[in-house]
Structure formats: C-alpha cells, structure tokens
C-alpha cells in the first residue's frame, strides 16, 4: 500500500526517506553544564533514527552560553563542542536518518544566574527576572553567534539547520509587539521587528547552503499579539531570503490559556502553506499514522513533526506503518522480528 507519510521528500540536495521528523525537544542532560553531548544524547537520538524517523532534529542548541534555557542545555558556542555533535550526527546517519539541529537563544526565558537578554526590559511573567534590554552591540554579537553556530553545524555533519523563532525565546521576542517595545530600527513596525531575524538568516546564508527551516509561534494567543495572518507576511519575507520550510508551532511568548486538542496547530501549517506559498511542517498532538497521513493527503503540510509520541515510543514509525498497511523496510539487524508490533500504550 502506498503512503504519503512514508514517501520520500527532497529539500535542496537532501532527501528524507519519509515525512516523519523528530521534533526538537530539550532533554536538559548536559550534566556537566558545559553544553557537551553525553552518552544519553547518542542513545536518545540514535534510537529514533533506528526507529525509522526520516529526519532526527536535535534539541534547541544554544549559540551562546547566556542563551541557554538552563545550565544543562546543549551548546554550539565553541569549537570544542563540535566533536560531540559530530558523534551525534554519525549515530543518526549510521542508523539511516538525516540529522538536523535547532539553533537557539533563550532570551528573557534563560533561567541562569547571569542576566537574561531581551529586546526590551519586560519579564515573561511576575516570577521570572526582568531581562536587560539588548544594546546594538549585543544584537550584532548574537547575529554573529548564529552565523558561527551554522559553520559549526556544517562541520558537525548536520544536513538541516532550523532557526528557533518560536515559544517566546529571543527571536520570537523581537517579532512580537508584546515583548518588543524598542524605538530603534529593531522595534516598532513589523519590518523593524523582523529585522533581527532577517539579519540572522542573511548571516547564516553566507556560510550555509543546505536546507534551512524556521520554527515560528504562529499565534500569540493575546488580543494585542500576533496572529497567523501576521506570520503570513513574516514567512513571505523568509521565503524571499531562501528559507525552505516553516515549522508551525504556536504560543509561549506570553502566558496564555490555549485550547489544546489533537492536531490543534495543523491549521497554522495549512494557512502558511496556502498564503505564503512555502513548505510547512505540522506539529502538536499528532499521535497516529492515520492522523499524519490525513494531514499530508489534505495538503495541509509537507512534513510531520512528532514530539512526545516519539518520547513514548522511539519506534513510532513502525507503529504508524502497521496502522497504514505500509511495509516498512526494517534495519537488517531486526529482520528476525518481522510482522506487526503492538500499538498499545
């Protein structure tokens, strides 16, 4: 039986064997607080590759030490971190998948002892510290840090880079009028609020020619915040700059009540795909093969990002294939265990 979910997908010169992407999820497991990959990361990501995920995207990886969400985040701010990341991509490639990295800066959500940086001195909520408004020098240094991180990503063997522009972290803070009250060229109009991300994309394009994704929060869930229609213009600009795919998440730039249900963010992937004419990834409570297949068949997205379901079961692709009646080619080491596997959770 044919399946869209298990059909290949090519972006530039990178071909994914199927449409399943492991969504980036922080593991907070750099136990020495030095940003280094540990044995846990090798097993964690290698197992999902062996489980037949098409693209394994490692977690938000900080471009600067002060840009970590926590002290135990992975980092890519120094050349000494390349070796561990290269081991990770080798594990992923050896098990049949492509490897992606999400480059990130936590901004005002950095829970560290040092000052948190943000476009404006506005805390996320009443319990978190008030960040320091970034100077233009700090902005330029951060843009350079993203560029240097892209160089290291290439040296580490990654096939795809994703820029983390969602979930209330630094880039998202610049994009949203709820967190960006600047009066210079980095604040005010949508064009100005986009400038920080524009300059990051330009800087990465100077050193990286592989597939480039951007994760967005397509809805601020606030009456004065951004909606998916605002992101249509942002993503049109991203496409003009050469971004290949928009990973469509939502929320977390300010505290908000969100009506969560299966596939609740698919609408954003569909809207951006249709109105910005750019490839999209759907993410958020996608938990079955049938659900993923329907999203693709309805042309609502091009890739399916799976998060918590892959934490529950690293062999989710096998379960999805069984559900869809698709004969998935197994790793040769597992050929002695043919047939269906349980879908019980």
UniProtKB/Swiss-Prot annotation:
Residue numbers binding substrate: 28, 164-167
Keyword Ubl conjugation recorded: no
Top-level EC class: oxidoreductase
Molecular function per GO: FMN binding; NADP binding; NADPH dehydrogenase activity
GO biological process entries: response to toxic substance
Binding positions (FMN): 23-26, 60, 102, 215, 307-308
Catalytic reactions on record: A + NADPH + H(+) = AH2 + NADP(+)
Pfam families linked: Oxidored_FMN
Cofactor(s) needed by this chain: FMN
Signal peptide: none
Keyword presence, Oxidoreductase: yes
Assigned EC number: 1.6.99.1
Database matches in SUPFAM superfamilies: FMN-linked oxidoreductases (SSF51395)
Keyword tags: Detoxification, Flavoprotein, FMN, NADP, Oxidoreductase
Subunit note: Homotetramer.
Entry function: Catalyzes the reduction of the double bond of an array of alpha,beta-unsaturated aldehydes and ketones. It also reduces the nitro group of nitroester and nitroaromatic compounds. It could have a role in detoxification processes.
UniProt family annotation: Belongs to the NADH:flavin oxidoreductase/NADH oxidase family. NamA subfamily.
NCBIfam families registered for this protein in UniProt: PRK13523.1
Protein name according to UniProt: NADPH dehydrogenase
């Amino acid at each position: 039986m044919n399946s869209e979910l298990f059909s290949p997908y090519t972006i530039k010169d990178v071909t994914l064997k199927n449409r399943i992407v492991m969504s980036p999820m922080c593991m907070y497991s750099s136990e020495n607080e030095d940003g280094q990959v540990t044995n846990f990361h090798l097993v964690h990501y290698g197992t999902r590759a062996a489980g037949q995920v098409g693209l394994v995207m490692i977690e938000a990886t900080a471009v600067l030490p002060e840009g970590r969400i926590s002290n135990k985040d992975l980092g890519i701010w120094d050349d000494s971190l390349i070796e561990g990341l290269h081991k990770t991509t080798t594990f992923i490639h050896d098990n049949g998948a492509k490897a992606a990295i999400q480059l990130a800066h936590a901004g005002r959500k950095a829970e560290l002892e040092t000052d948190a940086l943000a476009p404006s001195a506005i805390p996320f909520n009443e319990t978190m510290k008030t960040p320091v408004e970034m100077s233009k020098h700090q902005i330029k240094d951060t843009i350079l840090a993203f560029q240097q991180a892209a160089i290291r990503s290439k040296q580490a063997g990654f096939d795809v880079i994703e820029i983390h522009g969602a979930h209330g972290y630094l880039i998202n803070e610049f994009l949203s009028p709820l967190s960006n009250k600047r009066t210079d060229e980095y604040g005010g109009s949508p064009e100005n609020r986009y400038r920080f991300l524009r300059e990051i994309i330009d800087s990465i394009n100077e050193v990286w020619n592989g597939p480039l994704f951007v994760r967005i929060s397509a809805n601020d869930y606030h009456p004065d915040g951004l909606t998916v229609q605002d992101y249509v213009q942002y993503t049109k600009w991203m496409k003009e700059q050469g971004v290949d795919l928009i990973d469509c998440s939502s929320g977390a730039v300010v505290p908000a009540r969100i009506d969560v249900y299966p596939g609740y963010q698919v609408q954003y992937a569909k809207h951006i795909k249709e109105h910005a004419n750019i490839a999209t990834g759907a993410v958020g409570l996608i938990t079955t093969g049938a659900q993923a297949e329907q999203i693709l068949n309805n042309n609502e997205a091009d890739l399916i990002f799976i998060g918590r379901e892959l934490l529950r079961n690293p062999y989710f692709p096998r379960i999805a294939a069984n559900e869809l009646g698709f004969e998935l080619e197994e790793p040769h080491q597992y050929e002695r265990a043919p047939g269906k596997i349980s879908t019980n959770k």
